[in-house]
Amino acid sequence: MLHQLSLTFGSRDLLDKIVKQNSDRRFVLLAATGGAKDLQLLDISGQESIFTSHLDYQVKIEHGQPDWQGFFSFNYFDLNAESAKVFEGEVNKIAANPLPDGMTTMLVLSKLKNSSEYILLTIWDSSDAFMIWRRSNKFAPFTKYATSLNNFHAATYQLAPPKKQPEHDQA
């Protein structure tokens, strides 16, 4: 089981450099969906963070076996202590059941330096499977947290495509 996950954002060159300089770690490079150029690098080695972003999270709940492939949904919440207990209880109930069709992993993360900041990270076979779940009553337990009061925001990612190699002119 993964106990810690760290993440950072940056340009392709910067993130590739981090990966190259830390070959002893396991990373996942993600690209934002919808045509955005945003890149995110996950350190899934479980080791202390090497990033300066301070986006370091404790894995509170893990359901499924992450293979770190597919479609990634990040839902961010800032919860007070009481809401956090209720949220974790509801997620534990959900985690006691089989994952929804197409979901391979559900992770609940809380920030190491500010435990009121949560991420619900779900990994899917496809964006279609995610959208079906998102519109179903199985997502209902999360809708009450998906408000501006909880500083809610969401982002979706997929594995970043391999870096294009420069084409060499053939003379």
Label every PLM stretch briefly.
Residues 1-102, 107-115, 129-135, 152-171:
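Short S/T/G/P-rich N-terminal loop/turn motif that feeds into the first structured element of a domain
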Residues 120:
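Cys/His-rich zinc-coordinating modules
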Residues 138-148:
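Mixed-charge, glycine-accented linear interaction segment located at domain edges/termini
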